[in-house]
């Protein structure tokens, strides 16, 4: 019994530490990207996966202590996938005592009709889901749409675009839709997937499998995910470093002519030149007979 009590105490300490870390990361992301503002109505999109459950959990926790007032509404899109347990999310939302909506939209049939057998359906499914959620956000007056993508998702997406699309592009922490009618936020931007997995295990969320439709994660993303896991094992902190690089862009050190004017780089030698970091230099020649008078002291040039 004593060992059990010790184990429980240790587990509680680990959970509290992890919870504080995730809340701090989410709070920092919200603050730094101005994700949530006074009087915002945040539509938290809940799929039933670990990430969206954790996002909702943390948002509700921050809502109680935030210096601003904002509303959180949980929304699940029931896409009519076979075997989807329709009772789980309503029961969960009811247990939390929060406002929620279940949106019924049979995108599953549309995807099955359009995508050939054996091909991944995730791309079309995602687009149909996004369009439905955008429309519903306007209907309920939501000013922000919160999605559960985390740091690993963003880094994976960047490499997918680099390796298979020849684009240096990822997922932004905050995004305005093309028609400018909706703003999407990703509060888990600074959170690692491994922390969310551990958090979900502690919280014992009623996780709903994401592959009820029968579609498997595409091979390209699987390869990228495996690569990042290997890197993270060999060099802890590498994923964080890669993500931070997306926050420190130097357009003049890349090659995109659309974001930096490489064609017009005129010399400007007006004014006094700043001193270089050396005091003297010698210039020599490959000639066999070297004329020492050709050596140049550039100290005062």
UniProtKB/Swiss-Prot annotation:
Kindly state what the record says about how the cofactor is bound: Binds 1 [4Fe-4S] cluster per subunit. The cluster is chelated by three Cys residues, the fourth Fe has a free coordination site that may bind a sulfur atom transferred from the persulfide of IscS.
Chief location category = cytoplasm
* Amino acids binding [4Fe-4S] cluster: 122, 125, 213
| CDD domains per record | TtcA-like
Which reactions is this enzyme annotated as catalysing?
cytidine(32) in tRNA + S-sulfanyl-L-cysteinyl-[cysteine desulfurase] + AH2 + ATP = 2-thiocytidine(32) in tRNA + L-cysteinyl-[cysteine desulfurase] + A + AMP + diphosphate + H(+)
- From what organism does this protein derive? Photobacterium profundum (strain SS9)
What gene does this protein come from? ttcA
Any other comment in the entry? The thiolation reaction likely consists of two steps: a first activation step by ATP to form an adenylated intermediate of the target base of tRNA, and a second nucleophilic substitution step of the sulfur (S) atom supplied by the hydrosulfide attached to the Fe-S cluster.
Q: Which Pfam families does this chain map to?
A: ATP_bind_3
Designated name of the protein: tRNA-cytidine(32) 2-sulfurtransferase
Q: Which UniProt keywords apply?
A: 4Fe-4S, ATP-binding, Cytoplasm, Iron, Iron-sulfur, Magnesium, Metal-binding, Nucleotide-binding, RNA-binding, Transferase, tRNA processing, tRNA-binding
> EC number(s)?
2.8.1.-
Any single GO molecular-function term of the entry would be: magnesium ion binding
